[in-house]
Amino acid sequence: MATPSLIPTDADRDHPVRIHRVTRTNRHLWYQLTVLQQPERARACGAGTKDSDRRPVDPPPVVELRIKEGNSFEEGKEITFDYNANFFLYASLEQSRRIAPGRMQGQPNPPILTGSPVSGMAYLDRPAAAGYFIFPDLSVRHEGHYRLSFSLFETTKDEKDLDIERASDDRLDTGADWRMEIKTSPFDVFSAKKFPGLMESTPLSKEVADQGCHVRIRRDVRMRKRDAKSNNGRDRREDDMARRRTVTPASEDPHSAAARARSMSNSSEHRVPGPPEPPGHPSAVDPAGRGHLSFGGPQYASPHQYGLQSRLPPPSPGGPYNPATQYIKPEHQSYRYPPSRDMSQTGPSPAPRQDGHDRRQSGPYVPPSPSVYSNDGRSRPESHPSYPSTPVSSHPANLPSDPSLVLPRIKSPSNSVSPSNSSLKITDLLVQPLPSSEPKLEVGSAPCPPPKTPIGSKRKHDQTFVQNDRALRNHQRQLDPHYNPVARPCSPVGEQYKRADGTYMYAKFSVFTM
């Protein structure tokens, strides 16, 4: 039996471990254990259901056993293959650093080594003629810093090979004798996220596998394959992002793009007019505006500013009032009378600007009735821009012969702006006068009519039926032209009819004879 002094106690040992034993027949046997392949890394496999996805210790530990007979190991005879006994090696796991025991006894730790901790000896010729213990299926449950401890056990078959201390016992012991122990170098057990991966199988593992031992051989480096795969995926994502950044849109037909823009727009009935013509272009209307009824005042703009005002931004509610650049709706208006017409003041009108996509110029257009009163004194932007259109008839209406029924013409301010793209004549804007024998009323001011409402929209209620917001004193009442008999007669006379805005028009009837 091996003496206790010969049992190795150094844990950090990479060198072979030897023991000496004397048998009953005075044979001197030498045993030598060498860890040919040290474990380097492992992945924690966990416990319970996680145990099914475990990774073995990499590389698999390989321990070599050699037995010699003689006075010394160097001078002894190799009898590893001739010695009649059975050997097996048992592996156990321990911490790489010894932990001092506490005063109180702690709870027993569950086993953290799983797999096949026992290996029988395999007689191989390579790399040398000896016995080898291979552990290809050892796994650790928890991460940490560990080392493996291998214990050699022998089952003797011949009585002459028993220890000398057991000479008095004539029968063989059916048990196994512990011979020696050897420990590996420390290795790390990583978690699944921190595990660097398995390495390629070592030449020793391949050589052992070639001789029939059950060792899993990896021909490629899984760690490098994983890194390359992740890098390739990242490169592909970067390439895709670069392509998305550098992709140029396909060229499309400008006509189809314009058609799509018109179809997506909700202003097909209201188009923004073109830019104004140069100042040198002759205007179609006299800038003084003498062919239209306009009660003068710096707070009222010329009626020919409608085309220009459609391109100006709406006024700010809190901003200063600028009569030169803003259109003012008819405000603070008293009675309205039809304007007079002067054909001598009308100039030739240039040809209207044609829009490539506008086909509404040929349709009829009915001018709306202007509002009589305004319910507030603030100016509001128009909800729809106005555009000139071809009137229903270009012939002037029949005017009454009584000059007393027509108010004198008042000149508008000289700074009035007339749009250059207007195709209307002054005669087209005139309204038939109202023949009445009532005395003329003195009015303080009367604004210009509101802009024409484009085809496809309706007049607002406040443009026709509006109340005055002036202060009423001395039992005064609102003067409504629809109901006031002083302003206009209550019922039409002759061939006249009353419109919704309070104006009277002549009706022509065909005479049939029987």
From Swiss-Prot:
Keyword RNA-binding: no
Nuclear localization signal, short sequence motif: residues: 40-45
Transmembrane segments: none
Pfam family, one: Velvet
Biased composition (Low complexity): 256-267, 412-423
Stretches with biased composition (Basic and acidic residues): 228-243
Keyword Transcription regulation: yes
Disruption phenotype: Reduces by 80% cephalosporin C production and leads to an altered hyphal morphology.
Subcellular localization(s) per the UniProt record: Nucleus; Cytoplasm
Composition skew (Polar residues), residue ranges: 386-396
Residues of the Velvet domain: 26-218
Chain residue ranges for the region called Disordered: 219-463
Domain of life: Eukaryota
Keywords: Cytoplasm, Nucleus, Sporulation, Transcription, Transcription regulation
Region (PEST): 411-448
Entry comment, domain topic: The C-terminal PEST domain is a region rich in proline, glutamic acid, serine and threonine residues that is required for the light-dependent regulation of development and secondary metabolism.
Assembly, per entry: Component of the heterotrimeric velvet complex composed of laeA, veA and velB; VeA acting as a bridging protein between laeA and velB.
Function: Component of the velvet transcription factor complex that controls sexual/asexual developmental ratio in response to light, promoting sexual development in the darkness while stimulating asexual sporulation under illumination. The velvet complex hat acts as a global regulator for secondary metabolite gene expression. Controls the expression of the cephalosporin C gene cluster. Regulates hyphal fragmentation.
Family: Belongs to the velvet family. VeA subfamily.
Protein name: Developmental and secondary metabolism regulator veA
Organism in which the protein naturally occurs: Hapsidospora chrysogenum (strain ATCC 11550 / CBS 779.69 / DSM 880 / IAM 14645 / JCM 23072 / IMI 49137) (Acremonium chrysogenum)
